[in-house]
């Protein structure tokens, strides 16, 4: 799966979960300060991403992820591990 494809899927999830326009969900947008996500929103985002990509994001990793770019990198690393 390509970087852009992952980004677009995550962008859709974030926009839908937070009820915001897809255009403001950029790679560098911070979930809390830029997109207005609270801690419950973040948990729901992680769960939706885990379900969409059939991966598990451990809590300690989820706490470090603050924007879409970091999510995309994490998903790519997980998918590469699975396919190897």
From Swiss-Prot:
In-chain residues carrying the UniProt-annotated modification O-(pantetheine 4'-phosphoryl)serine: 39
Keyword Phosphoprotein belongs to the record: yes
Xref: Gene3D superfamilies: ACP-like
GO MF entry, a single one: acyl carrier activity
UniProt PTM: 4'-phosphopantetheine is transferred from CoA to a specific serine of apo-ACP by AcpS. This modification is essential for activity because fatty acids are bound in thioester linkage to the sulfhydryl of the prosthetic group.
One Gene Ontology cellular component annotation held by this UniProt entry: chloroplast
Primary localization: plastid
InterPro entries registered for this protein in UniProt: ACP, ACP-like_sf, PP-bd_ACP, Ppantetheine_attach_site
This protein's record includes keyword ATP-binding: no
Stretches that traverse the bilayer: none
Keywords per UniProt: Chloroplast, Fatty acid biosynthesis, Fatty acid metabolism, Lipid biosynthesis, Lipid metabolism, Phosphopantetheine, Phosphoprotein, Plastid
Entry similarity comment: Belongs to the acyl carrier protein (ACP) family.
Function description: Carrier of the growing fatty acid chain in fatty acid biosynthesis.
Protein's name according to its UniProt entry: Acyl carrier protein
Organism: Porphyra purpurea (Red seaweed)
Taxonomic classification: Eukaryota, Rhodophyta, Bangiophyceae, Bangiales, Bangiaceae
Gene for this chain: acpP
